[in-house]
Regions:
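Membrane-embedded alpha-helical bundles of multi-pass transporters/translocases
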Residues: 1-167
Length: 167
């Protein structure tokens, strides 16, 4: 079980890190190619790309939730993910209110709040599994994760060199 969980973590990071980097750097062109026509203006593209970028920061944690939650279910523990999800729901509502309305980030604030809430809930589930000796912090510092970061950096530098992207 522990080996399967470790492999799942490595796979999540291997997929999430390059996706995160790519989506952040290409947020505007992606939004423009999908929606920039008709009533959707350049201003809308820029504002929508902010939301995409802030959701991207939560991408690894959204993906980790798909690994962490079934890890509890497979051990017949449905209460822990339930209580963490309930906490995350309230935290998400509070953070969305703070970022969207009090700090004035608008729709991008909703993305920030959602990303921070999923970060908190995935960290809680991760540390509960760590306490049960099913995970260790060493999985975060695995060489696969560094390879994903390095390959993402190479990808960005190659696009920057060949396409001339402003960074």
């Amino acid at each position: 079980f522990k080996a399967s969980l470790d492999n799942s973590f490595r796979l999540v990071f291997f997929i999430a890190i390059p996706s995160l980097i790519g989506l952040i750097y290409f947020a505007e062109p992606i939004i423009a190619s999908l929606f920039y026509r008709g009533e959707f203006s350049e201003f809308d593209v820029i504002k929508s790309s902010y939301s995409l970028v802030f959701f991207c920061y939560g991408l690894p944690f959204f993906m980790l939730m798909k690994v962490l939650t079934p890890a509890f279910f497979s051990r017949q523990d449905t209460k822990t993910p339930f209580y963490v999800a309930l906490f995350s729901l309230f935290l998400n509502a509070i953070l969305n209110y703070i970022f969207a309305f009090k700090l004035g980030y608008g729709h991008a604030g909703l993305a920030i709040g959602s990303s921070l809430a999923v970060l908190a809930s995935s960290c809680i589930l991760f540390f509960v599994l760590m306490k049960q000796n099913l995970l260790s912090l060493s999985i975060i510092f695995h060489k696969t994760n560094f390879a994903a970061i390095f390959s993402s950096l190479i990808m960005f530098l190659a696009f920057d060199y060949f396409v001339g992207i402003d960074s």
